[in-house]
Amino acid sequence: MNAYLKIAVLMLLLSASGVARASLSCTLPGGVSLNFGNYDDTSTSNTDVSTTFTVSCCRNPPGSNDTLSVALGPSTNSTAANRITTRQMKNTVNADRMTYQLYSGSFGGTIWGDGVIGGSVVTQAISTNTNCPGSTVFTVNSAIFGRIAPQQAVSAGTYSDSLTISILP
């Protein structure tokens, strides 16, 4: 059977755990979504998609260089013991789960996680030349790379998951 699955948007909950460094303040304006589109469970190819997101930072006084670590938290829908190394989207009408993964740098590269439970954080040097409450906008990493492995035996439907992005000094 050739079941095409409408993969719901994977929402990366950007309730960013704000940076707690003395005078540095960072936020994630808006949300980030990763839409895998239709999934063909008979295909022998991975389903790969990517997206970027931006972070806004300001500092009092401005003009400093900082290094931030960006962590992606565990899957809220995974039933695995390690919800980072085994992320799962859940069917919105039944108990089916579809395994996927998020990477930094490239598809199938380093798992983007929290550096504690699993995966690695992404570190980025920034220059904050804007005094608070203004902001300097920069792009964190070039992309989040998402991959669904081929030939997963799941029912047709809409699948979704959410996780939290944390920005750490």
Regions from the language model: what does each represent?
Residues 15-20:
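N-terminal signal peptide c-region/cleavage motif recognized by signal peptidases
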Residues 105-135:
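Extended, solvent-exposed segments with strong compositional bias
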